[in-house]
Each structure stands twice: as C-alpha cells, then as structure tokens.
A protein has these predicted regions:
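Alpha-helical segment proximal to the catalytic Tyr-Lys
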Residues: 132, 181-183
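Active-site helix of classical SDR
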Residues: 127, 169, 177
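Substrate-binding pocket helix/loop in short-chain dehydrogenase/reductase
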Residues: 93-104, 108-113, 214-215
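Conserved glycine-rich Rossmann-like NAD(P)H-binding loop of the short-chain dehydrogenase/reductase
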Residues: 29-45
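Canonical Rossmann dinucleotide-binding motif of NAD(H)/NADP(H)-dependent dehydrogenases/reductases
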Residues: 2-34, 180
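The beta1-alpha1 cofactor-binding region of Rossmann-like NAD(H)/NADP(H)-dependent oxidoreductases
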Residues: 40-41, 57-70, 109
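Residue(s) in the substrate-gating loop at a strand-loop-helix junction
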Residues: 153
C-alpha cells in the first residue's frame, strides 16, 4: 500500500507517545489521519499542529467508538489503515504486605478489569469495527484492501513485578492477532502486532524513578 493523500488512517491513542509518533509519520507521507484519544487537552492542539482530525473516543465504549468512526469517516473517508496504540497500565502485586504496617492487600480486581477492557477488549472493538468498514472498499492494484497494526509489548513475554494485568492484556493482543489475520486474509486485509520495548512516553513518564530504572534494567536491547 502506497502511503499518500489517497489513504485514510485512524490511530487510537494518537495524541501522544507511540501513537503521536505514528500520526506524525503518516502525516509526513500525506496520509489523512484521524486521532482517537480521550485526552482532549493534548489531542486538539496536536491534531491542529499535524493536520489530523481529533475524535474524543473511549475505546471501552461502543457508542463512543461508533461516533468516532463516523466522525473520522465523514472528514477523511473510509480508513484503509488502523493503528491501535490506545492503552494504559498500572502496578499492583497479586498480593503483598506493607512493610511498615503489615497490612496485606491483593490486586484490586476492578483495576485488573480496567486494564483488560482498555488494552485488549478496546483493541478488538476497534479492529472489528474498522475491518467492517474496510470491507466496503475495493482492493487496491497492489492487492491490499486494508492494514491493521496492533501494539502489544515486550511485557507480554517478559512481564515484571506488579504487571500481571498489563502483561495479560498485551499477551491477549498477541494471542488474537493470528486468528484475526486469518479471519481477514481472504478479504485482503493485513493484520500485524508489534512488541515495543521501553521508551519515554507519557504512560512511563508518570512512574517513580525507581520503577522506571527497574523496568529499564530488564530490557536487554536496545537500552
């Protein structure tokens, strides 16, 4: 697929971090881009700067995602590219003891569910709805109808302390990639998943320095 102004793309989590870098890269090629992100304070000026369309979308909510696709398609036409970067994390041990008070706590199940809903279910929700739209398009001369890229993490295969929910969510993204790719292969839609390592994004920036150092120490290459 040649990246130019004839192509429309949607990037979830596109207001910052890896998603933001993806938006910049696509716009540099002339691709029409819509950003799905809940952070309006960051998303609106970033979209204005890059020439993208900002859509305030919560990937855990069906109606919000439907409205986002409708807004993006009204502005840019049916997307041929979907890049899923929307995601979040937290840090809770499965169970642990407070060294000072002796209090014992377990992983808050609502926080576990929140990570799964955003990182895994939200990713699938956007894939399914985007793929349905892509099916209305003709196949390009090079044989492509559409392309979907998902973001997992090295944490899916090498999870660290306190990362049970995050690792599970990203492992789920990896696990569903091949079945989805097979589902859509006969329709000329490619599906791939990347496993980024550790790099400086707003998600990581909010972590304490000792946590960032501990995570960085586990990344083999590149540092």
């Amino acid at each position: 697929m040649k990246l130019d102004s004839s192509i429309s793309a949607i990037v979830t989590g596109g207001a910052s971090g890896l998603g933001g870098a993806t938006v910049r890269a696509l716009r540099a090629k002339g691709v029409k881009v819509a950003i799905f992100d809940m952070n309006e304070k960051t998303g609106v000026p970033f979209a204005a700067e890059t020439g993208a369309v900002y859509c305030n979308v919560n990937v855990t909510n069906d109606a919000s995602v439907d409205a986002g696709f409708a807004q993006a398609r009204a502005a840019n036409g049916q997307e041929r590219i979907l890049v899923n970067c929307a995601g979040t994390g937290n840090a809770f041990k499965t169970a642990g003891r407070n060294k000072e008070t002796g209090e014992i706590k377990s992983f808050p199940i609502d926080q576990f569910d929140r990570i799964i809903q955003i990182n895994l279910v939200g990713t699938f929700r956007c894939i399914a709805k985007s793929a349905a739209g892509m099916l209305t398009l003709d196949v390009l001369p090079d044989g492509d109808r559409g392309a979907i890229v998902n973001t997992a993490s090295v944490a899916a295969e090498d999870g660290q302390i306190g990362q049970a929910a995050y690792s599970a969510s990203k492992g789920g993204v990896i696990g569903m990639t091949l079945p989805i790719a097979r589902d859509l292969s006969t329709e000329s839609i490619r599906v791939n998943t990347i496993l980024p390592g550790l790099f400086n994004t707003p998600l990581l920036a909010g972590a304490p320095e000792n946590v960032k150092a501990a995570l960085a120490a586990t990344v083999l290459n590149p540092k």
